[in-house]
């Protein structure tokens, strides 16, 4: 049991190292030639689905509005985002993708799908009962971490 605890600790430390300064962990590498942060790519992916405000993006990404503002300023400057004001309240600004950003957003979405597919492929190495145990373990561990 002690070795399992050590293995879990090593796994979590590796996750932290891989995730440092990133919003999420994705398997594989982006092939885009554009140097964007993971958060910026995720913003583009969210905006490919619908126009959103800074507050809505921050809530969906679970980051501060300041972090979103910083990421958005750079994306606007690079010509990847356009802004529009709310017709009812001109103080509210919505962001939407430009044609330049669409391929990057699509690639990030594909990267998400590849990551989920990889998790599914790893899970198939275990029986359905083992998968249930893994799920219970992960749920309990997340509960302890929070």
From Swiss-Prot:
<keyword id="KW-0804">Transcription</keyword>
<keyword id="KW-0678">Repressor</keyword>
<feature type="binding site">
    <location>
        <position position="42"/>
    </location>
    <ligand>
        <name>Zn(2+) 1</name>
    </ligand>
</feature>
<dbReference type="Pfam" id="PF01047">
    <property type="entry name" value="MarR"/>
</dbReference>
<feature type="binding site">
    <location>
        <position position="24"/>
    </location>
    <ligand>
        <name>Zn(2+) 1</name>
    </ligand>
</feature>
<feature type="binding site">
    <location>
        <position position="41"/>
    </location>
    <ligand>
        <name>Zn(2+) 2</name>
    </ligand>
</feature>
<dbReference type="InterPro" id="IPR001845">
    <property type="entry name" value="HTH_ArsR_DNA-bd_dom"/>
</dbReference>
<feature type="binding site">
    <location>
        <position position="107"/>
    </location>
    <ligand>
        <name>Zn(2+) 2</name>
    </ligand>
</feature>
<keyword id="KW-0862">Zinc</keyword>
<comment type="subunit">
    <text>Homodimer.</text>
</comment>
<dbReference type="GO" id="GO:0003677">
    <property type="term" value="F:DNA binding"/>
</dbReference>
<dbReference type="InterPro" id="IPR052067">
    <property type="entry name" value="Metal_resp_HTH_trans_reg"/>
</dbReference>
<dbReference type="GO" id="GO:0003700">
    <property type="term" value="F:DNA-binding transcription factor activity"/>
</dbReference>
<dbReference type="InterPro" id="IPR011991">
    <property type="entry name" value="ArsR-like_HTH"/>
</dbReference>
<dbReference type="InterPro" id="IPR036388">
    <property type="entry name" value="WH-like_DNA-bd_sf"/>
</dbReference>
<comment type="function">
    <text>Zinc-responsive regulator that acts both as a repressor and as an activator by regulating directly the promoters of its target genes. In the presence of zinc, directly represses the expression of the adcRCBA operon, of genes coding for a group of surface antigen zinc-binding pneumococcal histidine triad proteins (PhtA, PhtB, PhtD and PhtE), and of adcAII. Can also activate expression of adh.</text>
</comment>
<keyword id="KW-0010">Activator</keyword>
<feature type="binding site">
    <location>
        <position position="108"/>
    </location>
    <ligand>
        <name>Zn(2+) 1</name>
    </ligand>
</feature>
<protein>
    <recommendedName>
        <fullName>Transcriptional regulator AdcR</fullName>
    </recommendedName>
</protein>
<keyword id="KW-0238">DNA-binding</keyword>
<feature type="DNA-binding region" description="H-T-H motif">
    <location>
        <begin position="54"/>
        <end position="77"/>
    </location>
</feature>
<dbReference type="InterPro" id="IPR000835">
    <property type="entry name" value="HTH_MarR-typ"/>
</dbReference>
<feature type="binding site">
    <location>
        <position position="112"/>
    </location>
    <ligand>
        <name>Zn(2+) 1</name>
    </ligand>
</feature>
<keyword id="KW-0805">Transcription regulation</keyword>
<keyword id="KW-0479">Metal-binding</keyword>
<dbReference type="InterPro" id="IPR047894">
    <property type="entry name" value="AdcR-like"/>
</dbReference>
<dbReference type="GO" id="GO:0008270">
    <property type="term" value="F:zinc ion binding"/>
</dbReference>
<feature type="binding site">
    <location>
        <position position="30"/>
    </location>
    <ligand>
        <name>Zn(2+) 2</name>
    </ligand>
</feature>
<dbReference type="InterPro" id="IPR036390">
    <property type="entry name" value="WH_DNA-bd_sf"/>
</dbReference>
<feature type="domain" description="HTH marR-type">
    <location>
        <begin position="1"/>
        <end position="143"/>
    </location>
</feature>
């Amino acid at each position: 049991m002690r070795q399992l605890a050590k293995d879990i600790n090593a796994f979590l430390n590796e996750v932290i190292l891989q995730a440092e300064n990133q919003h999420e962990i994705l398997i594989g590498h982006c092939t885009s030639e554009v140097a964007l942060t993971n958060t910026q790519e995720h913003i583009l992916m969210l905006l490919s689905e619908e126009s959103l405000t800074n507050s809505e993006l921050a809530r969906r990404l679970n980051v501060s509005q300041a972090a979103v503002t910083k990421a958005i300023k750079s994306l606007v400057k690079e010509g990847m985002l356009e802004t529009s004001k709310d017709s009812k309240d001109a103080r509210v600004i919505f962001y939407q993708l430009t044609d330049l950003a669409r391929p990057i957003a699509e690639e990030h979405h594909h990267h998400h799908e590849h990551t989920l597919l990889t998790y599914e492929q790893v899970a198939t190495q275990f029986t359905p009962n083992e998968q249930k145990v893994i799920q219970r373990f992960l749920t309990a561990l997340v509960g302890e971490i929070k």
